[in-house]
Every structure is written in C-alpha cells, then in structure tokens.
Amino acid sequence: MKEIYLIGLGNPGKKFLNSRHNIGFLLLEYFSKKYNSNFLFKDKLKSSYSEFQIDNSSYRLFLPNTFMNNSGYAVRAIVDWYKINLDQIFIIVDDKDLPLGKIRFRRKGSSGGHNGLKSIIEQLQTQKFKRIRIGIGSPPPIKGEKNFNTISHVLGNISLEEKSILDKVFRRVIESLEKLNTKKEEYIINELNSFDKDQH
C-alpha cells in the first residue's frame, strides 16, 4: 500500500486557530474531516495525527505541536519514527509572498523567509522536500512606515471574504492530493500551479 505523509504547518492553541499562519493546520483538518477521521496527539511524533485510506493509499496527516518556528523537530520525529523517504512527505504551508488564492507546488527550494520551512531545512539538512504553498497575500502598509506589518498580518485571523477564497483553494488542493495514487506527480503539480480562484 502506498503511504502518503502530509504535514501542515501552524501554531497550536485557540489563540492561533483561525490565523493566516495556520493555513497548513486548517487545510489538513478540512481533509481529515472529509474522511471522518479525528486527530489524536502523539507525543513521540510531537504532533497530532490522523490516518485514513483512499483506494490503495494510506494518508497520514500531522499537525506539529512545536509551534511554527520549531516545526523541524516534529518533521524530524515523524521521519525517524516511520523511517520514511523524504519523497513521501508533503509540507502544507502559508506564503505571504503569493497572492491570496494562489497555490505553488515545489519539490525543493529555500525557506523563502518562512520560519517553519527554515526549521525543517535545518533539521533535515536538506532543501529537497515537497511543499505546497498557499498564498495569503501581503499585508497592507502601515501608514507613515516603509515596512509592511508582516507579523500582525500572518498571525491575524482570516476574514470572511478570505475564507470564501480559501475554501476554493482547500477543495482544489484536497482533490489533487486525492489523485496522488492514480496520477503522476507532474500532473498534480500542473493542476495546483495553474489553479485560478476566479474560475472555480
């Protein structure tokens, strides 16, 4: 049976529940709920864990309990416990440098300034792992200042307008992930990277 490991990045706790930075958590919770599977905390994995099957594939979903900046410790624990090849892992992560509603699937790359990805790269000692980046858009500029209010933006709650767009994004990502056992990865990459929120 094919095993697929999906790790969503975010921060644990009610305070961050609906924040833009928790896109990875929110998407995997959406996915797990679709298959009536609940998350349970596993201390040895430093994560909450959910598992279900689609056709001949086993999907294992993880929500690290380490907080965003230490995500790598959870990913390392998951890799070591299951003794898995990094090619089986997909990281789901927010990206403020992508417009809201855009999706980017990459097989490797730098952290792009994202602390969660930075931690994973440090712990795995490689940039060669797959990541699905979901755009949350850039924050509006602060009046009288040159810099964007990045922290407030990523930790801020998702608005109703944003949620309606992200619902479309989540459906597309999940539909694509469901095809991992029947379609070639290149097909999935093209499907996600060409997604247009205005046509769905």
Swiss-Prot record:
SUPFAM superfamilies: Peptidyl-tRNA hydrolase-like. Keywords: Cytoplasm, Hydrolase, RNA-binding, tRNA-binding. The record marks N11 as: Discriminates between blocked and unblocked aminoacyl-tRNA. One of its GO terms (biological process) is protein quality control for misfolded or incompletely synthesized proteins. The active site is at H21 (proton acceptor). TRNA binds at F16, F67, N69, N115. Its EC number is 3.1.1.29. The record marks D94 as: Stabilizes the basic form of H active site to accept a proton. It comes from the Bacteria. InterPro entries: Pept_tRNA_hydro, Pept_tRNA_hydro_CS, Pept_tRNA_hydro_sf. GO terms for cellular component: cytoplasm. It is found in: Cytoplasm. One of its GO terms (molecular function) is peptidyl-tRNA hydrolase activity. Gene3D superfamilies: Peptidyl-tRNA hydrolase. It catalyses: an N-acyl-L-alpha-aminoacyl-tRNA + H2O = an N-acyl-L-amino acid + a tRNA + H(+). HAMAP family: Pept_tRNA_hydro_bact. Belongs to the PTH family. Monomer. This is Peptidyl-tRNA hydrolase. It comes from Prochlorococcus marinus (strain MIT 9215).
